[in-house]
Amino acid sequence: MRPHLKILVIEDAVDLLEQITSSIGNTITYFDRSDVEISLLEANSVAKALQFVREDGDIQAVVFSWDVVAKVKELTDVVPLNGVLNENTSPAAESVSSQNANEKTTGEKSSARNAVIDNNARVIDAIKRIRPELPVYVLGDAVKGLDIVNQANGIESFFYRNDIISDPESILGYIINDFDDRNETPFWTEYKDYVVESNDSWHTPGHSGGASFRNSPYISDFYRFFGRNVFVSDLSVSVDSLGSLSDGTHAIGKAQAAVANTFEVRHSYFVTNGSSTSNKIILQTLLREGDKVIADRNCHKSVHYGIIQARAMPVYLDSVFNPEYGIFSPPRMAQIKQLIEENTDAKLIVLTGCTYDGLLTDLKQVVNLAHEHGIKVFIDEAWFAYSLFHPALRDYSAIAAGADYITHSAHKVVSAFSQASFIHVNDPDFDKDFFKEVFAIHTSTSPKYQLIASLDVCRQQLEMEGYKILNELLSNVAELKSQMAKFKRLKILSPSDFANMFSHFESDNIGHDPLKILIDVSALDYSNQEIHRFLMDEVGLEIEKFTHSTILVLLTLGGMRSKIVRLYNALK
């Protein structure tokens, strides 16, 4: 299994499209990259190109020939695949659709949709709305080069069209280099290389690469169970080349910079003792004794502890609980606005962006109002670390909303080890030096390097295949919902069900993460303990959470289709 660099080429002149792809394709062997599969995909229309971008997660680069003819309808039809946050329609798309329907007759709408767009920068914008991580390389005429670059945002590089045909190696070289940069793992690569060298250890940890376990008649089974690599890769801060977690130097610093680039923030930091510690680091950085902080009463206990440690004064938002199903919703937007306006001297507002059950706050409203009053916004997004990487989820992302501080439990729903966490900072007033002092207070001087490496490769996966995996998961969830709709006594709860549970669900534009599958089991003639015992003991399924009337199933980046089939088979 190799990484796949699939290059989408967009040109509506068929002969020219074939000429461009043939020229680039014939140079692939020049680069001697047996470690990467390189292929090309042709699109002779914008509609087809955008369909490929939506459906083919292996696309890693786009070559766009400027002057392609595109119609308005090809761009307005760009909607998130499986956008199931609010009954298959995002709030923004639904609002625009309704407004257009009121303002135009059918004939006027048809004419407008078939109109040719006057600026191909809109095509690039459409690509970026679906896959913002995709680099777009523009081909154009020499005389238009500067005009094109001035018109369009999101261009990775520009090439004269004739030069590409005569010298295709230049653009392919650029594409491969950019692919390698995105795919880079600064810490994991350095770490792995050091371990493979098998240096003779005369430093901590005391087991010396597992020798104390391996040579013992009493505890050698511990070594055999985990295997050699776990022990030889258990290193110490004595290895200077790997850098320091508290200082963010060398390979660790480079890996953290890569995370910040992927998540589109100013700074990112690795934390190896969970988002509980990440939350406390942020709170102690921002709050002083007596400072007001507006907080969700139902937030994680680490937020309460952090407020206590800082000796700050909490102003609590009321919890909203549904006793029938045993789940909490986000606080009411009306109360959030009220407390912000009544406490304009507050230093910070802290909210849980995504609840345990997947209910999502419309954070853009919160951020905009808080920033109007000079209040910083900190979002605990522990359960929604993948939110940026698919358009069906992005509207509810804390980073996309403009929050100042965000924490992600990278071990909960993406591919890092337990206790691995990200801190993201977007605050223009960030006091980096003071943050580092607080970070050092809460951070071990002997961090587990495997956790740091897992955060590095977690970023790599989200950057390179996050969209592809999420797209497949969302498609699988939609199919599971369709199949389970046939059941008489089991039901996957949907946004309409949440709207019935919480009176503010629709008015507050609350969303739901479809990868948190909440199943209503109240119609079954079994207790939740009996259901739990059956799923665990009889079919070997360990479920995330039970209430008296629901079970919560998490689909994460490891949620293969076969797991979904096993779940369906157990419930059927």
Residues of each region from the PLM?
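Conserved PLP-enzyme active-site core in the AAT-like
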Residues: A43-V46, D247, T277-L493
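Short acidic/histidine-rich motifs immediately flanking catalytic phosphotransfer sites
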Residues: E55-V62, E342-L348
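Conserved C-terminal alpha-helix-loop-beta "cap" of PLP-dependent enzymes
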Residues: A478-K572
